[in-house]
Amino acid sequence: MPAQLIDGNALAKQIRSEAALRAARLTERGHRPGLAVILVGEDPASQVYVRNKVKACQDNGFHSSLDRYPADLSEAELLARIEALNQDPNIHGILVQLPLPKHIDSHKVLEAIAPEKDVDGFHVANAGALMTGAPLFRPCTPYGCMKMLESVQFPLRGARAVVVGASNIVGKPMAMLLLQAGATVTICNSKTRDIGAHTRDADVVVAAVGKRNLITADMVKPGAVVIDVGMNRDDNGKLCGDVDFAGVREVAGYITPVPGGVGPMTITMLLVNTLEAAERAAG
């Protein structure tokens, strides 16, 4: 029997409607949640992501501002703008769209965002808080993946989980969240000799590498949950993930599609993080 789909669009819609209600209650108290988005340069993919984030804010009763800058913006000018947003009481979340042009130090920029407004969860203070089990913000993509696992009531305590990919944005925080939920976690990276040797024993596989068809049916334990974070293009230019969807679907118990899986959840959890920041600021 084919795996049950975990529909990211449907789950995102449900969480967004709850977020919109909470946002409306805050707005009534004079604390409308506000997200500031900064885009530097003309990267086409970044423009799409930013547009989707701003639209999600508008559709759910959040205030949003979008600062677009040319690719030759100086690092000093960007840091000055971030500092102004740090001081703005109407802004509860600050998001700098990555990647940034090469002459700008991304690490320095992310560290300039006030930790209480770092709704991406990338600031070193928030990364450290995640490590100790008391995060102010969970990074949006791993947070969305955890909500998807929660939606199918998958018992993570004692489960074996394998995260394929060790990035600071997805892989590492994903592993920490799974660990905190009681799973036994293995992280595979580009140096891992035989990824399949790890994934074949896993109850949960999270693929977050950016390499299409990396996870095939013979690498998946029957009945496992497979979360596909990858965003790639096939030979026809069609969106696909890191998982061979057609093959793995015949083996897994649950699987997320691409598109329509993790993607909508990432933006949804950005709204949730912004909302939580606004609620903390409102007291």
Swiss-Prot record:
Pathway involvement of the protein, from the record: One-carbon metabolism; tetrahydrofolate interconversion
Residues that bind NADP(+): 165-167, 190
Domain of life, source organism: Bacteria
A single cellular component GO annotation: cytosol
Family designation: Belongs to the tetrahydrofolate dehydrogenase/cyclohydrolase family.
Disulfide topology: none
Source organism per UniProt: Cupriavidus necator (strain ATCC 17699 / DSM 428 / KCTC 22496 / NCIMB 10442 / H16 / Stanier 337)
E.C. no: 1.5.1.5, 3.5.4.9
Protein name: Bifunctional protein FolD
Reactions catalysed, as given in the entry: (6R)-5,10-methylene-5,6,7,8-tetrahydrofolate + NADP(+) = (6R)-5,10-methenyltetrahydrofolate + NADPH; (6R)-5,10-methenyltetrahydrofolate + H2O = (6R)-10-formyltetrahydrofolate + H(+)
The gene coding this protein: folD
UniProt keyword annotations, A-Z: Amino-acid biosynthesis, Histidine biosynthesis, Hydrolase, Methionine biosynthesis, Multifunctional enzyme, NADP, One-carbon metabolism, Oxidoreductase, Purine biosynthesis
UniProt function note: Catalyzes the oxidation of 5,10-methylenetetrahydrofolate to 5,10-methenyltetrahydrofolate and then the hydrolysis of 5,10-methenyltetrahydrofolate to 10-formyltetrahydrofolate.
Keyword Amino-acid biosynthesis included in the entry's annotation: yes
GO biological process entries: L-histidine biosynthetic process; methionine biosynthetic process; purine nucleotide biosynthetic process; tetrahydrofolate interconversion
Short name of one Pfam family: THF_DHG_CYH
A single GO molecular function term of this UniProt record: methenyltetrahydrofolate cyclohydrolase activity
Subunit field text: Homodimer.
